[in-house]
């Protein structure tokens, strides 16, 4: 079986794929009889007024035949701030796929214990509590991103910055402020060996 993999809230560009684009891709999947797989780790971190973009926003009226073709990759690492736990889920509206995946990974995988506790705790939350959490996360990241962009422009006049529509990534373009012989590889090597940043009187390694 074949499929198309999409990332509606992109890492590392911060671009948000429109729902209309996802619907058009879904039509191709129906026409070609293939799966539509979507990495939705950042689904609820969006900054546009259009809301989240997701394969689960597609109705059978929008794309006849889409039911039973969708698989989403879910994770607690992003929206739930649990990057080290490495736990998530595959969600599908295809019963056969669900049964096969459950059989395969029950035998082959076991998530870490603390990750299971966290994921289990999320399952006990009400819909309203989860929606409130998503809203608080968007507000937090929106403020942080706006502040970061402002400070970067102040400290590095001429730098080109993207403004994310979703996820938590900003693309920095240094072409207007670096010399013509600037070597990216050497800069990254320097940062990994010597780079550090001071935050609240403590120094941290600068990773790019």
Language-model segments: which ranges?
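PLP-dependent class I/II
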Residues: 1-208
């Amino acid at each position: 079986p074949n499929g198309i993999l999409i990332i509606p809230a992109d890492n590392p560009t911060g671009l948000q794929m429109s729902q209309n684009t996802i619907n058009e891709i879904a039509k191709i999947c129906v026409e070609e009889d293939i799966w539509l797989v979507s990495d939705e780790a950042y689904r609820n971190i969006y900054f546009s007024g259009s809301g989240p973009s997701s394969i689960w926003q597609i109705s059978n009226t929008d794309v006849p035949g889409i039911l039973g073709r969708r698989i989403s990759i879910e994770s607690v690492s992003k929206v739930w701030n649990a990057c080290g736990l490495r736990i998530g889920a595959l969600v599908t509206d295809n019963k056969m796929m669900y049964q096969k995946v459950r059989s395969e990974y029950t035998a082959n995988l076991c998530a870490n214990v603390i990750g299971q506790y966290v994921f289990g705790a999320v399952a006990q939350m009400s819909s309203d509590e989860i929606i409130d959490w998503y809203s608080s996360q968007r507000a937090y990241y929106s403020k942080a991103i706006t502040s970061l962009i402002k400070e970067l422009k102040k400290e590095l006049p001429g730098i080109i910055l993207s403004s994310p529509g979703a996820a938590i990534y900003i693309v920095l373009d240094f072409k207007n402020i670096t010399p013509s012989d600037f070597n990216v590889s050497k800069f990254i090597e320097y940062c990994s060996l010597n780079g550090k940043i001071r935050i609240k009187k403590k120094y941290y390694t600068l990773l790019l």
